[in-house]
Amino acid sequence: MSACRSFAVAICILEISILTAQYTTSYDPELTESSGSASHIDCRMSPWSEWSQCDPCLRQMFRSRSIEVFGQFNGKRCTDAVGDRRQCVPTEPCEDAEDDCGNDFQCSTGRCIKMRLRCNGDNDCGDFSDEDDCESEPRPPCRDRVVEESELARTAGYGINILGMDPLSTPFDNEFYNGLCNRDRDGNTLTYYRRPWNVASLIYETKGEKNFRTEHYEEQIEAFKSIIQEKTSNFNAAISLKFTPTETNKAEQCCEETASSISLHGKGSFRFSYSKNETYQLFLSYSSKKEKMFLHVKGEIHLGRFVMRNRDVVLTTTFVDDIKALPTTYEKGEYFAFLETYGTHYSSSGSLGGLYELIYVLDKASMKRKGVELKDIKRCLGYHLDVSLAFSEISVGAEFNKDDCVKRGEGRAVNITSENLIDDVVSLIRGGTRKYAFELKEKLLRGTVIDVTDFVNWASSINDAPVLISQKLSPIYNLVPVKMKNAHLKKQNLERAIEDYINEFSVRKCHTCQNGGTVILMDGKCLCACPFKFEGIACEISKQKISEGLPALEFPNEK
């Protein structure tokens, strides 16, 4: 796309939250029972069920099991599948419905399209089989009108997983145009984009507010809740998070290169990753034995709004085939695998753009000792300034000056970026190109401070790689084609599967933490977020006793 550097005047929201570390999560795989901690609990699963009957059309049989207790207190986490399958020889004939397109054209993929869509230059079948054996030159629907394909339109309708995981694929074929040339004009770039059939409306608008907001959290668990709020508030879920697929066969291959988990290795064994699992665990791992402060910087850019068509949508061939491959009897593992591939819900409408979110881990004790205040940190990083995205260039306010990182007073000068006042930076960025992601990671690997200019660089790339930043959700089972054989049964099974999925990976299967600690379930392992006066993997250790002379325990960060 050529529009990544061409924005109209836009105003971004920068939210700055001060997350004071009055809560700390203390979990450590190195800690043993000999140190006086709680006894470790390994993942425990129920026995396998009996094998199902052989499905005559799928030629497979299935079995399942349940998670009884999640790993906790340095025990083994639950990472194994709850479903299993194997090939079989059916004893009954398959009564599978044959694809019949009637008077329409049947693609090699099995899709049925209108005959008028043949030989028009568009890939209406998804494999260009509708463009084979044409007797004359294609008749493009847009003729000589100049249009471009839109990344915003491709992203429209993308789903979410109720437990926070990024779906591996989208159900919508947003490169199908149904022979139409519906064009939408981006007022920022003056470019016309062709709107796919599935998208009922797409409005390009780069907007926001020039606004700074500061929030203060007395407990770190409340700060953590604020970070994951958008992933749980819509469903009133407890703190149960699952970022790694366990049921999908191709999960390992699919997930290694997703935008949310690209890795970059530096010298030695240090590894930086955008994996949500690692990111959240990194945030939770900071101990409050050294008083910490968390500077939460958040900026959103909205590029456009969309509404999906509510009927006659065109789904990808893969999505339709995967629905057909679901057994008509309810098999938990198979339906969970489907949910982990496509999400539990899809977006019927929403906003597209990017979310720039960083958490700076600040050493509060060092700041006090060296006379550095929070406003000095913000001024050094440039987050006290307004940011403008202009048509020809992207810039920050003229006041941004690297000299602001040196604070002078009482006969001394403190360089904020080199005095170990900023311990770490945790990235929760969504959207933007892979090129920018690698550039940012390289800076973090080198220990270079990330400031407002990095926000500007990121903003220039989100048109090429937008993400959903707000959405109205609909259950994925609403997309089951009504004319498909056994559609009603499979829709019922998917509805049941979503409920079972939430209950299967529930924090209720964790043991309680001691002394008022809060339990967090993350990727098959239960963690304890401890009140300020306690620490340990179960919040079992009183810091008051440590201060009275008992040996202190160390809690190195989990890698």
Curated annotation (Swiss-Prot):
Keyword Electron transport among UniProt keywords: no
Domain (TSP type-1): residue spans on this chain: 42-95
InterPro entries xref list: Growth_fac_rcpt_cys_sf (IPR009030), LDL_receptor-like_sf (IPR036055), LDLR_class-A_CS (IPR023415), LDrepeatLR_classA_rpt (IPR002172), MAC_perforin (IPR001862), MACPF (IPR020864), MACPF_CS (IPR020863), TSP1_rpt (IPR000884)
Transmembrane segments annotated in the record for this chain: 235-242, 265-272, 374-381, 382-390
EGF-like domain mapped to chain residues: 510-540
Residues glycosylated per entry: 48, 51, 277, 415
UniProt domain MACPF: residue ranges: 138-509
Signal peptide start and end residues: 1-21
Effect on the protein upon substituting residue 283 to C: Creates an artifactual disulfide bond that prevents the conformation change required for oligomerization and pore formation
Residues of the LDL-receptor class A domain: 99-136
Compartment list: Secreted; Target cell membrane
Pfam family, one: TSP_1
Gene Ontology terms: cellular component: blood microparticle; extracellular exosome; extracellular region; extracellular space; membrane attack complex; other organism cell membrane; plasma membrane
GO biological process: cell killing; complement activation; complement activation, alternative pathway; complement activation, classical pathway; killing of cells of another organism; positive regulation of immune response; protein homooligomerization
Function, in words: Pore-forming component of the membrane attack complex (MAC), a multiprotein complex activated by the complement cascade, which inserts into a target cell membrane and forms a pore, leading to target cell membrane rupture and cell lysis. The MAC is initiated by proteolytic cleavage of C5 into complement C5b in response to the classical, alternative, lectin and GZMK complement pathways. The complement pathways consist in a cascade of proteins that leads to phagocytosis and breakdown of pathogens and signaling that strengthens the adaptive immune system.
Oligomer and partners: Homooligomer; about 20 C9 chains oligomerize to give rise to a huge beta-barrel that forms a 100 Angstrom diameter pore in target membranes. Component of the membrane attack complex (MAC), composed of complement C5b, C6, C7, C8A, C8B, C8G and multiple copies of the pore-forming subunit C9.
UniProt-recorded name of the protein: Complement component C9
